[in-house]
């Protein structure tokens, strides 16, 4: 199992199964802060799942860099620690938090339910 980069604890396997039960979700992955792929759920090609893990880690790193810079530049606080993100496309969503990410169909996805589930499994 991967250690969650943001929480410093082992991720729980039931978390991925719980995330898979959300409306529209067709895949779930664990990812490390370095982009390593952990466990997966759903029918995801291994190369695609690895690419998603790397994208999730890169997105979190870019957010951290931007939030740190903005905080130092403006003095505004509240952007850190970084927790998660959602990428939206026409038909698909990738949402990640606490070292886990889900892939979902946009038309069926419930962002509020996903946010609550991510927080419940953290």
What residue spans do the PLM features occupy?
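Non-catalytic interaction/Regulatory regions outside core domains
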Residues: 2-122
